């Protein structure tokens, strides 16, 4: 299986467009968070739509820079791996979005206890 893995997009669609040949050649796009810069659902939808032009097979988690509404968008589209596992062929993908607390204020952080609850679910 050929993967196109990306993280820390922060709303920038130009690099995605430049990677079109790689995305089209992949079997699956994996987004490992920080989809937005402005943290909004609208910006996340724009980034996801850009990727969807080139691939319909996407798995993703929201990042600590993304608001919960971005997680909700990924879930609505069936792309979210937050607290879930999904098999793609013989390969398992498992995810946890956001982050543990950081020195800087970010949109989505989880305490160690919250992380443990998600991972145990």
Where are these regions (language model features)?
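Conserved catalytic scaffold of divalent metal-dependent phosphoesterases
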Residues: 66-121
């Amino acid at each position: 299986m050929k993967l196109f893995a990306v993280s820390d997009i922060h709303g920038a669609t130009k690099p995605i467009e430049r990677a079109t040949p790689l995305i089209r050649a992949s079997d699956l796009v994996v987004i490992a968070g920080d989809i937005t810069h402005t943290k909004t659902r609208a910006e996340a939808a724009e980034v996801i739509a850009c990727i969807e032009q080139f691939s319909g097979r996407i798995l993703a988690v929201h990042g600590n820079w993304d608001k919960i509404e971005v997680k909700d968008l990924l879930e609505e589209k069936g792309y979210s791996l937050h607290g879930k596992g999904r098999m793609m062929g013989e390969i398992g993908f498992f995810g946890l979005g956001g982050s543990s607390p950081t020195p800087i204020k970010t949109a989505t952080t989880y305490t160690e206890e919250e992380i443990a609850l998600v991972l145990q679910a």
